[in-house]
Every structure is written in structure tokens, then in C-alpha cells.
């Protein structure tokens, strides 16, 4: 066997090994799990995870009923998610992580980092990252979401709600 053939075989074996390792690492990652609901960051994380898993009734339970335009039912909440889908950003592959929490009395602000991935060619990951805030209020010893810059219908904060 020629030296160039051995080098080529070595390169091919190396590439195959890299692909196998990448697959193992990807498949071995655990599924995200719900967190405890006694902290603002836990409630925010659970709300976003429930939306990603399309467990809309659970996500609805994290909203504060004191929101001016609070959806009257889980069915209305689901309808709003579909009507205002651009603000819920559920059509792309996203990773969400809690960055920080600021608590002031019965109010809290949770800062969330969103990384969005779009399909591209081999050398273009098309990844974008942004940070947004979610506002919570402590009601009857439970943290409830009262506003979020994303994953929230802005009409919920209006007196008349969504139409």
C-alpha cells in the first residue's frame, strides 16, 4: 500500500470517528427538566420550557391573573399563541437559559438568553443570540409572570386584552 493511500485512509477514519463522537455527545445530552416553582427563575424557566414542549395549559398557569388582558381560559391562551406566533418564536430551534435574577420585595426581573439556530450551509451556523427580561410578581406565595419582552402577547397588558 502506498503512503498516500495510508494517509487518505487515516483521514477518512478520523472524519468517521469525529462524526461518531459528535453523534454520541448530541444523543447523550439529557432532556431539559422542569425546575422548582418557588423561585422567579424556576417559574420563568418552566414557563418557557412548557411553551417549547407545547404544554400550553401548564404554561398558562404561570401567568398572573392580575394582567389587564389576562386570557380568560387556557383555550384563549393557546389561540393567542398561534395568532401572535411571531412573539412566541416557536418556529425556530432555540435554546433558552436564565442569565440573572433581580428580586426587589414582591417583584422580580429574570433575564433570559435566547440562542436561535437556523439551517445553513456547512460553514454558516446562522446562530443569533439575544437577551430579554421577564417580569414576575409574588402573589399568594407564588411567583407569577406579569410581562415578558418575548414569549408573551403584548396585548395582554392592555385593558381590553387581545381581540
Region annotations inferred by a language model:
Residues 34, 38, 42, 50-57, ...:
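Soluble non-cytosolic domains of exported or imported proteins
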Residues 47-51, 60, 76, 134-138, ...:
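Broad hydrophobic/π-residue packing in well-ordered secondary structure
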Amino acid at each position: 500500500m502506498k503512503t498516500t493511500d495510508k494517509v487518505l485512509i487515516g483521514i477518512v477514519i478520523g472524519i468517521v470517528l469525529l462524526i461518531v463522537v459528535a453523534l454520541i455527545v448530541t444523543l447523550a445530552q439529557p432532556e431539559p427538566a422542569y425546575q422548582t416553582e418557588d423561585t422567579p427563575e424556576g417559574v420563568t424557566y418552566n414557563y418557557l420550557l412548557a411553551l417549547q414542549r407545547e404544554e400550553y395549559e401548564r404554561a398558562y398557569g404561570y401567568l398572573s391573573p392580575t394582567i389587564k388582558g389576562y386570557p380568560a381560559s387556557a383555550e384563549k391562551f393557546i389561540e393567542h399563541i398561534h395568532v401572535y406566533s411571531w412573539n412566541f418564536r416557536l418556529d425556530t430551534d432555540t435554546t433558552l437559559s436564565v442569565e440573572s435574577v433581580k428580586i426587589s420585595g414582591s417583584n422580580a426581573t429574570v433575564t433570559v438568553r435566547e440562542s436561535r439556530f437556523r439551517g445553513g450551509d456547512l460553514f454558516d451556523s446562522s446562530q443569533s443570540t439575544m437577551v430579554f427580561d421577564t417580569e414576575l410578581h409574588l402573589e399568594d406565595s407564588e411567583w407569577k409572570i406579569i410581562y415578558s419582552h418575548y414569549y408573551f402577547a403584548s396585548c395582554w397588558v392592555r385593558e381590553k386584552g387581545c381581540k
